[in-house]
Amino acid sequence: MEGLTDRQLEVLRFIASQIEDHGYPPTIREIGEALDIRSTNGVNDHLKALERKGYLSRDPVKSRALIPTSAAREALGGGGEAGSNVVPLVRGPARPGSRMIEIPIVGRVAAGMPILAQERVEDTVQVDAFLLGTNKKVYGLRVQGDSMIGDGILPGDYVFVKKQLNADDGEIVVAMIDDEATVKRVYFEGDRVRFQPSNPRMAPIYVRHSDFRSTMILGVVVGVYRKLT
């Protein structure tokens, strides 16, 4: 594995710390501001180097898709057993002293025709804190339906949700609409709010701002887990 410069290590450490603290990676602009890198091109140069050297996995079309690999975990002092595309998940209580955090699984949520989410804890799972951070407001929901397949969220997946009552434009949220829970991207458009599926065969849900009190954002999706067997 090719070594890192001091600056590259600094960038990698900042990305990892943001995931640890907030449950999601920083944007390119946030990296530049935090580390006094004046241009986005400068940040991108460091990110490309980290990716080329095998320390970072990234999606060029998504600003927050910066995932440290197992090699990065080793470089930063963590374990390296899991692949960069795997969310470690174990049922039952977390072992004392481990880096695993316990996530409650709360009912089910529709990613298609909305169904009522059962607001009760059905199970708990363990997830590596390096991937989701240590935020205690994260919970899991099981997805039904295929309206979010364009974002890689498939029927039977678990979405990990950071509990909050607001969201930024374009984020994937769990929302309660007319007492029904659903997973969609949210867009604020003038006098209405659009909840957009990523399956092109499905239509968006529109809610007028005047009716928004009957629509509650339950949280922002910060991760997805899929069983492979």
From Swiss-Prot:
What Gene3D superfamilies does the annotation carry?
Umud Fragment, subunit A, Winged helix-like DNA-binding domain superfamily/Winged helix DNA-binding domain
What's an example of a GO molecular-function annotation for this chain?
serine-type endopeptidase activity
The record's EC number reads 3.4.21.88
Q: What class of enzyme is it?
A: hydrolase
Q: Which InterPro entries match?
A: LexA, LexA-like, LexA/Signal_pep-like_sf, LexA_DNA-bd_dom, LexA_repressor, Peptidase_S24_LexA, Peptidase_S24_S26A/B/C, WH-like_DNA-bd_sf
- Show the active-site residues: S147 (for autocatalytic cleavage activity), K184 (for autocatalytic cleavage activity)
- Domain of life according to the entry: Bacteria
Quaternary structure, per UniProt, is: Homodimer.
Name the job this protein performs. Represses a number of genes involved in the response to DNA damage (SOS response), including recA and lexA. In the presence of single-stranded DNA, RecA interacts with LexA causing an autocatalytic cleavage which disrupts the DNA-binding part of LexA, leading to derepression of the SOS regulon and eventually DNA repair.
**Name of this protein:** LexA repressor
Gene of this entry: lexA
